[in-house]
Amino acid sequence: RRILCASPDFLQRYGTPKALSELPGFACLVIKERDHPFGIWRLHNGTEEQSIKVTGPMASNHGEIVHQWCLDGQGIALRSYWDVKDNIHSGKLVHILPEYFQSANIWAVYVTRLAMSAKVRVSVEFLRRYFNEHYGAENTSANGGTLKR
């Protein structure tokens, strides 16, 4: 899952958005990704998906740079929960508009000839359980954690 977050300093200076429709009025930190339209955040609230066009003073194609800018109080970021979890728990970042999120998949990639390997099966199952346990992933694979060719 990806969530919206910002530093307490940023929120103190500029306020906290109370609704998704307010995001375009805030400085957002955008990651340039190959397969995604620039500055369009597709967010779910559990029942529906909304697309929102955001802009901001800075953009990067490197997620860790955007993460650091967020910590530095430069704007609102859309980051993977596993990436910002510790910062949220320590108070360095604040989870904003918590009812909204973006789905994010984690893939285990391996060659077809290893699909039936017990080691691969055990490793993938371990990762599925780990991410479910530690990061609240609803489903870490498209087929429920089972391997298929």
Task: Name each model-derived stretch.
Residues 1, 5-31, 46:
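Flexible hinge/capping segments at coil-to-helix
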Residues 6-8, 79-82:
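Beta->alpha turn/N-cap motifs
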Residues 22, 39-53:
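Ligand-binding cleft/hinge of the Venus flytrap
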Residues 23, 69-73, 88:
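Hydrophobic residues within well-ordered alpha-helices
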Residues 30, 51-62:
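Short beta-strand-to-loop elements that line the ligand-binding cleft
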Residues 65-67, 84:
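Short, hydrophobic alpha-helical packing/hinge segments within bilobed ligand-binding/sensory domains
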Residues 75-79, 95:
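Paired acidic/hydrophobic, glycine-rich loop segments that form the ligand-binding mouth/hinge
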Residues 81-86, 90, 100-149:
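C-terminal effector-binding regulatory domain of bacterial HTH transcription factors
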